[in-house]
Swiss-Prot record:
It comes from Shewanella frigidimarina (strain NCIMB 400). Binds 1 FMN per subunit. Belongs to the azoreductase type 1 family. It is an enzyme of class 1 (oxidoreductase). Pfam families: Flavodoxin_2 (PF02525). This is FMN-dependent NADH:quinone oxidoreductase. Homodimer. Quinone reductase that provides resistance to thiol-specific stress caused by electrophilic quinones.
Length: 197
C-alpha cells in the first residue's frame, strides 16, 4: 500500500485553489487504496526559524525548552518524510515565491547530518527512495519563465535532501479571467488524473 504525505501551505483556508487540487488528488488516490496523511501548514503553522532555534536544531547540551520543542518537532517532520513513499506539496505562488508556511517547514527539515551531509565533493542528500509531486497554483502565467521562483526552488531543496524524483503539476492564469481560471484548473486535474500512484 502506497503511503502518501500531503503538505498544504496556503493561508486561504477553504478558498485555497492549491488545497482544493490536492484534495482532488487525495480523493483519487484514496479510492485506489493509498494511505494518506495530510499536514496543513496554513492551519497549523510551524515556528519561524530564528537564531535560538537554529542553534537548537544542531543539538547539544543545555538547550532551552523552546529549543527542545523545536528539535522534537523537526524530528517529527523528518520522520514523516521517511515514513511515506510520496510527498505531495501544495505550493501556491505568493509574490513570486512560496508561502512562509512552507518555508518554515523547509527550515525545520533541512538539517545537516539528518537529511543531508557535507562531503569533500559537496552536499549529499540522505533521504532516499522518495518521490515528490509539486502542485503549484498561481494567478498569472509563469511556468518556465524568470518569474517562477517556486518550482526551481522546491526542486533544488528536495534534491538537496535526496529527493530527485520530482514531478510538477501547474494551475496557472487563475486570476486572468474566468475562462483562463477554468482552463487552468481543468488542465491541472487532467494532469493529476494522469499520474500513476
Amino acid at each position: 500500500m502506497a503511503k502518501v504525505l500531503i503538505l498544504k501551505s496556503s493561508i486561504l483556508g477553504s478558498y485555497s485553489q492549491s488545497s482544493a487540487l490536492v484534495d482532488y488528488l487525495n480523493q483519487q488516490w484514496s479510492s485506489k487504496g493509498a494511505q494518506i496523511k495530510v499536514r496543513d501548514l496554513g492551519e497549523n503553522t510551524l515556528p519561524m526559524l530564528d537564531g535560538e532555534l537554529a542553534s537548537g536544531l544542531r543539538g547539544g547540551d543545555n538547550l532551552s525548552e523552546r529549543q527542545l520543542s523545536a528539535l522534537a518537532l523537526s524530528d517529527e517532520l523528518v520522520a514523516e518524510i521517511k515514513a511515506h513513499d510520496t510527498i505531495i506539496i501544495a505550493a501556491p505562488m505568493y509574490n513570486f515565491g512560496i508561502p512562509t508556511t512552507l518555508k518554515n517547514w523547509i527550515d525545520l527539515i533541512a538539517r545537516a547530518g539528518v537529511t543531508f551531509t557535507y562531503t569533500d565533493t559537496g552536499a549529499v542528500g540522505l533521504i532516499e527512495g522518495k518521490r515528490a509531486i509539486i502542485v503549484t497554483t498561481r494567478g498569472g502565467a509563469h511556468k518556465g519563465g524568470p518569474t517562477d521562483h517556486v518550482v526551481p526552488y522546491l526542486t533544488t531543496v528536495l534534491g538537496f535532501i535526496g529527493i530527485n524524483n520530482v514531478e510538477t503539476i501547474y494551475a496557472e492564469a487563475l486570476n486572468m479571467g474566468p475562462d483562463a481560471a477554468e482552463t487552468g484548473i481543468s488542465q491541472a486535474k487532467l494532469a493529476i488524473d494522469a499520474i500513476t500512484l
